Design a protein with these regions (language model features):
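Extracellular/periplasmic juxtamembrane helices and adjacent flexible linkers that interface
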Residues: 253-334
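N-terminal segment of the mature folded domain
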Residues: 24-153, 295, 330-331
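Bacterial N-terminal signal peptides that target proteins for export
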Residues: 1-10
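Ligand-binding pocket segment of bilobal, Venus flytrap-like solute-binding proteins
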Residues: 170-237
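Periplasmic-binding protein-like
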Residues: 114-119, 179-186, 192-194, 226-259, ...
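Short helix-loop capping/hinge motifs at secondary-structure junctions, enriched
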Residues: 127-133, 152, 165-173, 252-260
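Sec/Tat signal peptide C-region and signal peptidase I cleavage site
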Residues: 19-23
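Short beta-strand->loop
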Residues: 31-33, 124-126, 144-171, 186-189, ...
């Protein structure tokens, strides 16, 4: 009797061993800012292959893109993001303040949870007919400047602060003279799109404006896709070091059971393949080895960090909160 039972047990175990192991299907939602579409299309495919090879599971990553501030508000209002990859730390801080992302999120990954950096450059039309060379040229009469709305766009906030930082560095400058400079700049802005990609469309496809204040990656992408026979990149004398951060949305991944995959997804941005994809899409890799490897791909610009303007909490309150500098100086149609 024992022998028969034992043989039956062995037979069952053999069948179980031969049975196929079914792969799990996991779906992540990456809520990102406006001009990262191409980056994450490439990266999502690479991560899915990596995760399949490592675990056997199938991963589908859905993307949502828009102005960074607008995207942060959508997550706060219930958009069920597994990860956020936004334009600036303040937007993830805002999500964290609502209890969706745990405090200290910026310490979870290397380089303050920013796997890539960028900066702000100028995209002008071929031949640079208005002879725009630096920030000071943007306030000249007759120059039309395209930039998004800093109330909704992270890129626009970087544009604004890069311009402000330049103005503060001029001889005899003060916060008041820097504000005056910004007021003159915005008088030359005919339209404020809600996000960086919309501003690029206005400049490139609609033909509006003499100069686009652009993410460096967006300008380089436009040059690649549309050709140097139509546009040129102008590197200003100084610009801001933009550090777009990433984070797992803790409350959502714990509810959905996707934490392990979501965390691995962000960690893979720091891998060899992740950093190569980042560089291919014209973002500056954060990992030193790849930053050095691709340094010649980018203009040599003196960059200053947001900490020189007090950090994002202070800059947001002073410049972009209701009643802040932007509200005080922006007068549409005047």
């Amino acid at each position: 009797m024992f022998r028969k039972t034992f043989i039956r047990s062995l037979a069952v175990l053999t069948l179980l061993a031969q049975a196929p192991v079914f792969a799990a299907d996991v779906t992540l939602l990456n809520v990102s800012y406006d001009p990262t579409r191409e980056l994450y299309q490439d990266f999502d495919s690479a991560f899915a292959r990596h995760w399949k090879a490592k675990t056997g599971d199938n991963v589908t990553v859905k993307q949502s893109h828009g102005g960074s501030g607008k995207q942060a508000r959508a997550v706060i209002d219930g958009l069920s993001a597994d990860v956020v990859t936004l334009a600036l730390a303040y937007d993830i801080d805002a999500i964290s303040e609502r209890g969706l992302v745990a405090p200290g999120w910026e310490k979870r990954l290397a380089y303050r949870s920013a796997p890539y950096t960028s900066t702000i450059v100028f995209l002008v039309r071929k031949g640079n007919p208005k002879q725009i060379r630096d920030w000071g040229d943007l306030v000249k009469p007759g120059v039309s400047v395209i930039t998004p709305n800093p109330k909704t766009s992270g890129g626009a906030r970087w544009n604004h602060l890069a311009a402000y930082g330049y103005a503060l560095r001029q001889p005899g400058a003060s916060p008041q003279t820097a504000r005056d400079y910004l007021a003159k700049l915005y008088k030359n802005v005919p339209v404020l799109d809600s996000g960086a990609r919309g501003a690029t469309t206005t400049f490139v496809e609609r033909g509006i404006g003499d100069v686009l204040l652009a993410w460096e990656n967006e300008a380089l992408l436009a040059l690649r896709e549309l050709g140097p026979d139509k546009f040129e990149i102008v590197a200003p004398s100084i610009s801001i070091l933009a550090e777009p951060p990433v984070a797992v949305v803790d409350k959502n991944v714990d509810k959905k059971g996707t934490r392990k995959v979501a965390q691995a997804y962000l960690e893979y941005l720091y891998s060899v393949e992740g950093q190569e994809i980042i560089a291919k899409n014209y973002y500056r890799p954060a990992v030193d080895r790849y930053a050095r490897k691709y340094a010649t791909q980018f203009p040599n610009i003196k960059l200053f960090p947001i900490s020189e303007l007090g950090g994002w909490t202070q800059a947001q309150k002073a410049h972009f909160a209701d009643g802040g500098v932007f509200d005080q100086i922006y007068q549409p149609g005047k």
